[in-house]
Design a protein with these regions (language model features):
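Bacterial N-terminal signal peptides
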Residues: 1-8
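Solvent-exposed, well-ordered loop and adjacent helix/strand elements within mature globular domains
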Residues: 13-130
Length: 130
C-alpha cells in the first residue's frame, strides 16, 4: 500500500512536490528550566534538535515498519538543543517539550503506537513567507 500525504505549510509549497524526510527518533522532555537555549520561554509546540534546526519548523510523522509514513504527530518550533548526544548533533533525534511527566508519557505512548517504536520521519521547513 502506498500512502501519499499532501501538506501545505507555506503558499510556495506545491502539492506535487515531495517533502524531504529524515529518518529519526523522537523523545519527550520536561525540566526545571523555563527557557530554551535561544532564550524563549518554553511552551507547548517547542522542540529541541541539532543547532542547524534552531528557528525552523519541524514536522513529525510516525515511521512505521517498512519505513511507511504513519500518522502526523505534530508541528513544532525548534528553539532548543538536545543533550549533546550523537543523535541530536547529527539531526536525527527530536526532543519534544511537554508541560509535565504525564504529558511526556502520553507523547511517548503516541510515538510507540502502530508498532512505530519511537521511530519518526522528520520534515524540516526551512522558511515560511506567508
Amino acid at each position: 500500500m502506498t500512502v501519499s500525504i499532501a501538506l501545505t505549510i507555506c503558499p510556495e509549497v506545491k502539492a506535487d512536490e515531495q517533502p524531504t524526510l529524515i529518518k529519526g527518533f523522537a523523545t519527550a522532555y520536561n525540566g526545571p528550566s523555563e527557557y530554551t537555549c535561544t532564550g524563549k520561554k518554553v511552551h507547548e509546540g517547542i522542540c529541541g534538535g541539532c543547532e542547524a534546526y534552531i528557528g525552523k519548523t519541524i514536522i513529525l510523522y510516525q515511521r512505521l515498519p517498512g519505513d511507511q509514513i504513519g500518522e502526523l504527530i505534530g508541528i513544532y518550533e525548534c528553539e532548543d538543543t538536545g543533550p549533546g548526544t550523537e543523535g541530536f548533533q547529527q539531526g536525527y533525534v527530536i526532543d519534544v517539550w511537554c508541560r509535565n511527566l504525564e504529558e511526556c508519557q502520553d507523547f511517548m505512548n503516541l510515538i510507540y503506537t502502530n508498532n512505530a517504536q519511537g521511530r519518526v520521519w522528520i520534515q524540516i521547513v526551512e522558511e515560511c513567507n506567508g
